[in-house]
Amino acid sequence: MTELKTLLLFLATAVAEIVGCYLPYRWLREDGSAWLLLPAAASLALFAWLLTLHPAASGRIYAAYGGVYVFVAVLWLWGVDGVRPTVWDITGSLIALCGMAVIMFAPRGA
């Protein structure tokens, strides 16, 4: 799988997970409708399915995915929550992305 396809798949996976967790949050913390749980469940199912599309070992996928999740969560903070990330938020998320790149794209010995 090419690096770009891997990154795009991780981004889609992160959005699916965040939406799947955000909707119950809205229901519980912001008096949202219980109907929010239906798309939340679908989003979390999509998240789990997307994780299976990666060709690498599951442990490596989970470890690398964490870096992308951090980055997308900071974007969510800005775009959905309306909170501008600090320089430390951005720096930390970029470090996490670097960790993902090392885990996923480093040369592997035979």
UniProtKB/Swiss-Prot annotation:
Keywords: Cell inner membrane, Cell membrane, Membrane, Transmembrane, Transmembrane helix. It is found in: Cell inner membrane. Pfam families: UPF0060 (PF02694). InterPro entries: UPF0060. The chain crosses the membrane at residues 4-24, 33-53, 61-81, 87-107. Its main location: membrane. It is a multi-pass membrane protein. One of its GO terms (cellular component) is plasma membrane. The keyword Magnesium does not apply. NCBIfam families: PRK02237.1. Belongs to the UPF0060 family. This is UPF0060 membrane protein azo2656. It comes from Azoarcus sp. (strain BH72).
